[in-house]
A protein has these predicted regions:
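Generic secondary-structure boundary/loop-capping signal
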Residues: 19-20, 27, 128-133
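Short secondary-structure boundary/capping segments
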Residues: 30-40, 73-80
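Switch/connector loops and helix/strand junctions flanking conserved nucleotide-binding motifs
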Residues: 26-29, 69-70
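Conserved C-terminal portion of the radical SAM core fold
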Residues: 1-26, 40-64
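Radical SAM enzyme core and accessory elements
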Residues: 45, 49-183
C-alpha cells in the first residue's frame, strides 16, 4: 500500500480475482478426475464475466483451450511424444505466450496423428487403471491417494500430519520417519 506512491489513497478499492480451470495432475488425489470440457469451462468463465457487476472488480482466468492442453500433457503417455515432435516440426514455439498460441494448429496435429486429446484430459479414470507414471516412486503410496480421493468426494479433510500421521508414505521415503514412527 505504501509503495504505491503514484496512486491516490483513500476509499477507492479495486479487487482482482483470478480463477484457474481445474487441471487434473499426476501424483495427486485428483489424478482420477476428468477435466471439464472446453465448452463447460467457457460456460463457467462466461458466468464469471457476467456476474461481475462492478468496475472495481476484475476477474482474470486462464484460457479454456490452454487449460485443456495442459490437462492433456499432464496426464498423457509416451504417445504424446509424437504430438510434441510434430508440433515442433510445424513451427509451433512459445505456445505458452497467448500471441503465439494456435489451438486449432494443435488440434490438427492430434487429428493428423489419430490421437484423441479428450481421452487424456476429460476422461474420468478408475482406481484400478495403470497410469503412465505409476512406475515412478515419489514416496506417496497410490493407496493413500485413492483414500484421499474418496475423502475429497465426501468433502472430508485429512488431519495435519504433525498432529496425526495419515500413513501416506512420504516420511518413509529415503529413510525418513513419520511423526508417529508408523513407517
Amino acid at each position: 500500500y505504501y509503495e504505491t506512491e503514484n496512486r491516490q489513497k483513500g476509499r477507492k478499492v479495486a479487487v482482482t480475482v483470478s480463477a484457474a480451470a481445474f487441471v487434473p495432475k499426476p501424483f495427486t488425489p485428483f489424478q482420477w478426475f476428468g477435466q471439464d470440457t472446453i465448452e463447460m469451462l467457457e460456460r463457467k468463465q462466461k458466468l464469471l464475466r457476467e456476474s461481475t457487476f462492478s468496475r472495481k472488480l476484475t476477474v482474470n482466468y486462464h484460457g479454456a483451450e490452454t487449460s485443456f492442453l495442459e490437462a492433456v500433457f499432464a496426464r498423457g503417455d509416451r504417445k504424446l511424444n509424437a504430438v510434441i515432435l510434430e508440433a515442433h516440426k510445424r513451427g509451433m514455439r512459445f505456445d505458452g505466450w497467448a500471441d503465439c498460441f494456435d489451438f486449432d494448429a494443435w488440434m490438427q496435429v492430434f487429428k493428423d496423428l489419430g490421437i484423441d486429446p479428450a481421452f487424456y484430459a476429460n476422461r474420468q479414470r478408475s482406481f484400478d487403471e495403470v497410469f503412465p507414471w505409476d512406475h515412478l516412486d515419489y514416496g506417496i503410496k497410490k493407496e493413500f491417494l485413492i483414500e484421499e480421493c474418496k475423502r475429497a468426494y465426501a468433502s472430508e479433510t485429512t488431519p495435519n500430519c504433525r498432529e496425526k500421521c495419515s500413513a501416506c508414505g512420504a516420511a518413509c521415503f529415503k529413510g525418513g520417519l513419520c511423526v508417529e514412527k508408523r513407517c
